[in-house]
Amino acid sequence: MAQIYVLHENNDWVIPLRKAFAERNLPYAEWYLDQWAVDLSGLPPHGVFYNRMSASSHTRDHRYSAELTATVLAWLERHGRVVVNDGRALDLEISKTRQYIRLAREGIPVPKTVAVVGQHALPDALSAFAQGPLIIKPNRSGKGLGVRLYETPEQIVGAAERGELPDTIDGTLLVQEYIRGETGHIFRAEFVGGRFLYLVKIDATGGFELCPSDVCELDTFCPATPRGKKFE
């Protein structure tokens, strides 16, 4: 059995993996990618490498974990190692703009979106929309953090003048058309290798922090603690 390596920066998220590996008696090791040295002239070990890096890593004081992981993945792939969630997956994980472009390339419609770098460019971005409602969101984030809803473009201008727009770790904010669902729910589908696994129905009436993870650090709700029917 090949050694399994889990690349991550959040111990809470790998607890289910540790349990599953132990139950199956699978050999594994963890690479905690917060601060690390990568010898690019050396050879990586043989095995299967599972990338568990998250776009929200910087919210846990791991500012450069995603960038470090990109280097590690490139090193692994250079030497032909088996990688689950390779550099292409990480590239999409940490950039909503690239997610939307890829979706559009595959013929999947996405809401109208304008990427903005710099507050002075905000009026040009807003001019692309005739009216609201609109969403402002960071290009890189996770768990719905930093997503704000505004009913009109003028509300966004006011928020910018007051310094109330969300922080963005890569300097890019997205202005996006907001599409209200008929029931107030959104749906999250999971696929692996092109195969459909499951669909999660999420009540979105209470806000945008909608992470259906096993363990979350949301102030308003944690799916690890059952509460109503927010997640089905």
Residue locations for each model-derived region?
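Short acidic/polar capping segments at secondary-structure boundaries
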Residues: 88-90, 117-121, 139-143, 153-155, ...
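Short, hinge-like loop/turn segments at secondary-structure boundaries
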Residues: 46-50, 101-104, 129-131, 152-154, ...
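Short amphipathic alpha-helix with an adjacent loop that forms part of the alpha/beta core around
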Residues: 37-47, 123-129, 163-164
